[in-house]
C-alpha cells in the first residue's frame, strides 16, 4: 500500500530579519513585503528574544547566526563559548588550560615563536579582545620570549572603523604586560572567508608565513591610512608591519571561538592534503584552536565542545522520521552543523542540500543571492512527501545587511518576501505547517543614532509567525492558536514537537510557544487569504 504523503512542519529562518518600530535606517520597514505583512495580520504571531541571556550570552550582547541556530536546534538555552572563555580569563583558569600550557611548553622547548591569531574585536561574535589579553598573560607566565600577534580587524560585528579602538587597546595591553608585538594586520574579508574563496585566505596566509621585516608602521597607522582611502576594517588588505614569520618550530593559537570563519585559514596551516592554493606545509608546527573548528583537523582544542543530547534533529531521527535541511553556502553550516549542536554528520533520515552562493565580492552586488534556488530546493523537498521537518535559511537580510548598503538590503528583503509567497503555496498544497522566524536582528537597524552606517547585528527581538496547515490539527490548541509573548529561540524546537505530537525530552528545557485553547479543536477554520498568489 502506498504511504500517504507527510504533511511537514517547515521552519523558515529569515537570517537577520529583526523587529524595530523605528523606521529610520530600517530596510525591512522600507521594503515592500506584502506576504509578510499579510501573514502578520492573518496568522498567530509573536516576538521572541534572540540576544543576551535568552540565548546564553552576557546581558546586552547581540545574538548571531551560530548562537541562534544552536539554540533553535537544541531547544534549550545553550551557554555560549564567549561566556565560557571570558569566565576562564576572569577567574584565571585560562593560565592552567592544559592545551594552552602544552603549546607554550613545546614552543619554549624548541626555542620557537608563539603566534596569536584572531579577530581583534569587542564584537563578541567570533572572538573577544579580552581573550587575547588573557593569552598575553599566559605567555608571560610561561616565559615565552617571542610572541607575535596576527591581528584580524572586524568592521562587521562592530562599527566599520571601530578597529582602531581595539588595536589601540591591544597596544596599551602589550605595553602593560610587557610582552608581544603586532606583526601582521588583515581584514576579516581575507583571513576569515568561509565560502572557499581561497584567493582571499592566501593573501592573509602569505603575509603571515613569508619572510620579511615588514614596513615598520604601527598597526593604528595601517588602519588610518586605509580609512583615508575609504577602506574600513573588514577589508584591510593583509600587510606585514614587523618581523615574526610563522615557521618550523613555532606554535599558533587561533583564539576565535566561532568555527565557521576560522576553518579555512586553519586548514591552510595544518591539513596535509590541502588543495586550496599552493603552499609548503610548515613542520613541526604546534597548533591550538580555542574551540573545535572541525573534528578532522589535526589540532589541539583549548575548550572542548559541550555535549548536547536529545536536540531537535536527534529527536526527529529517533522517532524514525525524515528531515531535510537547505541553505545557500553562507548559511549552510548553520542549518546543519550548528543546528545539530556542533555535529558534522547528519542524523539518520536527515537529508541536506547545499545551494551555492553567488561569487561576488560583497552581496550588495547581488542582493537576491541564491534565494530563488533555495526556494526551489525546499519546494522540491516538500513535494517528495517524505519529510516531517524541513529547515530552510534565507541568508539575504543578514548578508546584504552586513554591507551597510540600505538600498540593496531593501532589494534583498523584497526578494525573500516573494520567495516566501511561493514557498508557502508549496507548503499549503502539502497540508503542512510553517513557522517563520529569524535568528537575530540586522536589516531593521542600519543607521546608528548619529546617522552612521551600522553593519553589525542588533539586540532587537524577531518576529515569529505560525502559518497553520489545512491537514494538521494541533490537539489542545484549537483553530485560532495563540502564541506566548515571552518566548525565545529555545522555545521553537518544543513548539515543533508540540505540532508533530512528539514528546519533549527532559534535556530540552524550552517551552512550547503554543497557548492552550478552551474551544473545540475540530471546529472548522476559515482560511484567510494572505496574498500569496
Curated annotation (Swiss-Prot):
Q: Which cofactor does it need?
A: Mn(2+)
Q: Which Pfam families match?
A: iPGM_N, Metalloenzyme
Q: How is the cofactor bound?
A: Binds 2 manganese ions per subunit.
* Binding positions (substrate): 126, 156-157, 188, 194, 258-261, 331
Residue numbers binding Mn(2+) 1: 398, 402, 457
Q: Which GO terms describe its molecular function?
A: manganese ion binding; phosphoglycerate mutase activity
Q: Name one GO cellular component term.
A: cytosol
Q: Which SUPFAM superfamilies does this chain map to?
A: 2,3-Bisphosphoglycerate-independent phosphoglycerate mutase, substrate-binding domain, Alkaline phosphatase-like
Q: Residues in the active site?
A: 65 (phosphoserine intermediate)
Sequence positions that bind Mn(2+) 2: 15, 65, 439-440
Q: Which reaction does it catalyse?
A: (2R)-2-phosphoglycerate = (2R)-3-phosphoglycerate
| Pathways per UniProt | Carbohydrate degradation; glycolysis; pyruvate from D-glyceraldehyde 3-phosphate: step 3/5
Key words of the record: Glycolysis, Isomerase, Manganese, Metal-binding
Q: Which Gene3D superfamilies match?
A: Alkaline Phosphatase, subunit A (3.40.720.10), BPG-independent phosphoglycerate mutase, domain B (3.40.1450.10)
**What subunit structure does UniProt give?**
Monomer.
User: Which family does the entry's similarity section mention?
Assistant: Belongs to the BPG-independent phosphoglycerate mutase family.
HAMAP family named among the record's database cross-references? GpmI
Q: What does this protein do?
A: Catalyzes the interconversion of 2-phosphoglycerate and 3-phosphoglycerate.
Question: Under which name does UniProt file this protein?
Answer: 2,3-bisphosphoglycerate-independent phosphoglycerate mutase
Instruction: Record the organism.
Output: Trichormus variabilis (strain ATCC 29413 / PCC 7937)
Q: Which gene encodes it?
A: gpmI
Amino acid at each position: 500500500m502506498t504511504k500517504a504523503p507527510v504533511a511537514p512542519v517547515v521552519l523558515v529562518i529569515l537570517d537577520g530579519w529583526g523587529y524595530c518600530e523605528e523606521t529610520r535606517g530600517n530596510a525591512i520597514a522600507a521594503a515592500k513585503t506584502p506576504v509578510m505583512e499579510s501573514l502578520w495580520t492573518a496568522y498567530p504571531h509573536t516576538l521572541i528574544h534572540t540576544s543576551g541571556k535568552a540565548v546564553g550570552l552576557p546581558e546586552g550582547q547581540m545574538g548571531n547566526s551560530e548562537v541562534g541556530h544552536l539554540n533553535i536546534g537544541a531547544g534549550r538555552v545553550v551557554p555560549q563559548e564567549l561566556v565560557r572563555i571570558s569566565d576562564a580569563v576572569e577567574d584565571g583558569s585560562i593560565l592552567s588550560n592544559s592545551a594552552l600550557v602544552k603549546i607554550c611548553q613545546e614552543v619554549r622547548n624548541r626555542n620557537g615563536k608563539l603566534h596569536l591569531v584572531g579577530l581583534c574585536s569587542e564584537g563578541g561574535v567570533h572572538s573577544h579582545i579580552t581573550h587575547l589579553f588573557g593569552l598575553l598573560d599566559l605567555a608571560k607566565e610561561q616565559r615565552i620570549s617571542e610572541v607575535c600577534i596576527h591581528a584580524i580587524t572586524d568592521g562587521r560585528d562592530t562599527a566599520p572603523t571601530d578597529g582602531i579602538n581595539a588595536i589601540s587597546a591591544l597596544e596599551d595591553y602589550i605595553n602593560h604586560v610587557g610582552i608581544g608585538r603586532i606583526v601582521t594586520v588583515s581584514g576579516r574579508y581575507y583571513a576569515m572567508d568561509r565560502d572557499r574563496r581561497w584567493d582571499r585566505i592566501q593573501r592573509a596566509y602569505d603575509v603571515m608565513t613569508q619572510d620579511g621585516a615588514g614596513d615598520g608602521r604601527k598597526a593604528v597607522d595601517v588602519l588610518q591610512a586605509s580609512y583615508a582611502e575609504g577602506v574600513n576594517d573588514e577589508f584591510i588588505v593583509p600587510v606585514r608591519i614587523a618581523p615574526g614569520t610563522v615557521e618550523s618550530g613555532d606554535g599558533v593559537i587561533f583564539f576565535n571561538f566561532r568555527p565557521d570563519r576560522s576553518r579555512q585559514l586553519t586548514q591552510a596551516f595544518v591539513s596535509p592534503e590541502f588543495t586550496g592554493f599552493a603552499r609548503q606545509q610548515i613542520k613541526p608546527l604546534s597548533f591550538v584552536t580555542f574551540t573545535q573548528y572541525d573534528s578532522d583537523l589535526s589540532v589541539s582544542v583549548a575548550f572542548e565542545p559541550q555535549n548536547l543530547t536529545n536536540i531537535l534533529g536527534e529527536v526527529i531521527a529517533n522517532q524514525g522520521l525524515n528531515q531535510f535541511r537547505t541553505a545557500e553556502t553562507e548559511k549552510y553550516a548553520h542549518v546543519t552543523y550548528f543546528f545539530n549542536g556542533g555535529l558534522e554528520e547528519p542524523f539518520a533520515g536527515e537529508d541536506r542540500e547545499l545551494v551555492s552562493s553567488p561569487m561576488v565580492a560583497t552581496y550588495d552586488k547581488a542582493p537576491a543571492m541564491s534565494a530563488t534556488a533555495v526556494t526551489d530546493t525546499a519546494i522540491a523537498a516538500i513535494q517528495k512527501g517524505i519529510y516531517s521537518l524541513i529547515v530552510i535559511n534565507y541568508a539575504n537580510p543578514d548578508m546584504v545587511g552586513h554591507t551597510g548598503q540600505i538600498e540593496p538590503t531593501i532589494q534583498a528583503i523584497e526578494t525573500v518576501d516573494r520567495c516566501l509567497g511561493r514557498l508557502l503555496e508549496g507548503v499549503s498544497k502539502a497540508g503542512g505547517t510553517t513557522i517563520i522566524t529569524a535568528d537575530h536582528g540586522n536589516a531593521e537597524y542600519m543607521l546608528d543614532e548619529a546617522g552612521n552606517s551600522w553593519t553589525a547585528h542588533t539586540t532587537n527581538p524577531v518576529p515569529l509567525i505560525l502559518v497553520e496547515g489545512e491537514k494538521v490539527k494541533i490537539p489542545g490548541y484549537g483553530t485560532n492558536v495563540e502564541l506566548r509573548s515571552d518566548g525565545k529561540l529555545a522555545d521553537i524546537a518544543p513548539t515543533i514537537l508540540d505540532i508533530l505530537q512528539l514528546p519533549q525530552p527532559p534535556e530540552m528545557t524550552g517551552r512550547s510557544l503554543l497557548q492552550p485553547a478552551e474551544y473545540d479543536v475540530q471546529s472548522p477554520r476559515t482560511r484567510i487569504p494572505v496574498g500569496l498568489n
